[in-house]
Structure formats: C-alpha cells, structure tokens
C-alpha cells in the first residue's frame, strides 16, 4: 500500500487521535501505520516536530524491545537539511519562568466562555442554516459589546460559507473568510488585508468597523491572530484550546468574551461527528461539569 497524506493526518492516527476516526477504529489506524512501515518524510525541515515524534516513539519502543527485534518502521528524510535530534529532556517551564512578569501574566490570563446549545430541526440543510444563524447572532452580540476583532471558528467549510452569506451586505462590519481549501496565494492576500487589525501585539486603536474573521480549523495552526472575542463551534478539547489561544493572546484586555456553540443533534448519546467522532460530545459534557468554563492556560483543569 502506498499512502500519500499530510503530517497532521498521519501523525494523529499514529498517536491514536486520528481526525475523523472513531474511538473503536483508532487502534486499527495506529496499527496499520505503526508496523512494518516506511515513512518518506518530504521537506523534513518543515516537519521537524513530526520527525522528532517518530524518533521519540522509536526510542520508547526500544526500551521494551531490544536487539533482535527489528525497528517498527523506517524513516527517510527528504530534505537538504535532514538533521533531526531527539532531546531526552522535553521542554518545560521552571519556577523562574512562572514568576517572570510577562509569562506569568499570560499563564494566569482568564478566558471565560459560555456554553450555548443550538436547537436545530428539519433536514440537514435546515439544521446547518439554523446553526449558521446562531453563530452570526453570537458574533453580533460580541460586536455590540465593543469587540473590534471577533473570531468565528467552525468545523466545516459549508458553515463558513453559510455564515458569509448571512453577513453579506452588512455595512457595519468587515468580514474575512479563511479556510484550509483556499489557495496559498489567496490565503496570503486575505491575511495581508487584515493583518494589522488582528496581529498579536498591535495597538488596539479605535477603528471605524469591527472585523469578523470566519474560519475553519485552519486557524488553529500557524496563525498569530489575537481576537478581542471568540465564537467557536464545539470540537475536541485540544482543538478548543488551540482556538482559545487566538483570544487575547498577550492578556492585554484583562476581560474577554467567548461563546462555545454546539448543535443539539451533535450532543445525543449516539452522536458521532464526522470530524471529531465522539470527542465533541465528550468535551461538551465534561465542560458542563465545571463550575466555570475558563480556557486560560492555568485556569482550565485537566480532565480525568
């Protein structure tokens, strides 16, 4: 079998966290990738964390299975700079780091969120439209509250397009759409047009119009955006933490607003999301056990 894929898709499956893979099938995907496999890692200098993960997993396996056993997989690094080392001592914060005034402020920042279920009914088209309407209403609340840069992050490109259609023609706001399906050139142009209004560390001067950035999961990586408020569709816990990392990144606002939306049909006992599987529902249920939902780095407890 020859499989061509991305680092995210392969890495998540190898670690039993495959995107869109159910809990029951996660071991199957990990087993197929984790035994008798040759990884051809293209442009390894752009995928150093994945190369390090492969090497670390190999070392971990060797602790339990020494020499006569062959390696579980091979790796060919296709790059002009293929040097990848594995640090046996992972990076952590020490006591001095935690008392540093800048870092301490960011670690202790509060990012409270409201859990808001969205009642949907009818056929799939009607349910998607109803959810998009709820997202627009939540974002409009943020704008009325004074937020000048609002992130709206949802799980599907179709939802992004529906939200854009509902916002079309509004003269009181600017709207920018970002999805993983955009051509790199189009994405760069779109980001370039809004960069000074969303970059971390900017001067939050008054602007004529608020900006709504409507995006999919594409915003979770490689985007140094800093929103004043956030509206997000519920997802897995790790995905939500990434999204909240785009909210008041430097703790300059002190108090922020965020809403987590979930379709009612995604919360049923048999609900199995095409992207996040049962993790979406499990995350929603776990968040409901908290007295206060706060996605600040040091404020969100670790689930059992």
Provide a role label for each language-model segment.
Residues 1-15, 202-220:
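Conserved two-lobed SF2 helicase motor
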Residues 137-140, 147, 162, 166-196, ...:
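C-terminal helicase lobe and adjacent C-terminal extensions/tails of nucleic-acid helicase motors
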Residues 68-74, 78-143:
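Interdomain hinge/linker at the junction between the two RecA-like core domains of SF2 helicases
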Residues 77, 148-155, 178:
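Conserved RecA-like ASCE P-loop NTPase motor core of nucleic-acid helicases/translocases
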Residues 183-215:
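Conserved helicase ATPase core of P-loop NTP-dependent helicases/translocases
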Residues 8-67:
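SF2 helicase catalytic motif II
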Residues 3-6, 40-41, 72-80, 212-216, ...:
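Structural recognition of the conserved hydrophobic beta-strand(s) that form the central parallel beta-sheet
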Residues 214, 219-234, 256-260:
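A short beta-strand element within the Helicase C-terminal
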């Amino acid at each position: 079998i020859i499989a061509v894929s991305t680092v995210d898709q392969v890495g998540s499956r190898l670690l039993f966290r495959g995107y869109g893979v159910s809990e029951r099938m996660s071991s199957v995907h990990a087993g197929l990738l984790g035994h008798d496999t040759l990884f051809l890692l293209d442009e390894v200098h752009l995928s150093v964390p994945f190369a390090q993960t492969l090497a670390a997993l190999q070392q971990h396996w060797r602790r339990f299975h020494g020499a006569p056993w062959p390696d579980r997989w091979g790796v060919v690094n296709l790059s002009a700079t293929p040097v990848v080392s594995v640090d046996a001592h992972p990076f952590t914060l020490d006591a001095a780091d935690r008392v540093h005034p800048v870092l301490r402020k960011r670690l202790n920042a509060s990012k409270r969120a409201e859990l808001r279920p969205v009642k949907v009914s009818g056929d799939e088209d009607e349910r998607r439209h109803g959810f998009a309407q709820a997202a627009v209403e939540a974002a409009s609340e943020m704008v009325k509250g004074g937020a000048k840069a609002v992130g709206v992050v949802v799980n599907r490109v179709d939802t992004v397009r529906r939200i854009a259609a509902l916002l079309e023609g509004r003269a009181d706001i600017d709207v920018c759409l970002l999805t993983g399906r955009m051509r790199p050139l189009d994405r760069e142009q779109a980001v370039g047009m809004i960069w000074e209004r969303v970059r971390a560390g900017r001067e939050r001067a008054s602007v004529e119009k608020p900006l709504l950035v409507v995006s999919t999961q594409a915003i979770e990586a490689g985007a140094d955006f800093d929103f004043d408020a956030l509206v997000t569709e519920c997802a897995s816990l790790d995905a939500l933490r990434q999204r909240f990392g785009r909210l008041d990144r430097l703790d300059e606002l002190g108090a922020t607003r965020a809403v987590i939306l979930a379709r009612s049909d995604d919360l049923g006992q048999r609900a199995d999301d095409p992207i996040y599987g049962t993790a979406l529902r499990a995350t929603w249920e776990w968040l409901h056990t908290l007295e206060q939902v706060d996605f600040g780095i040091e404020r969100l407890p670790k689930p059992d």
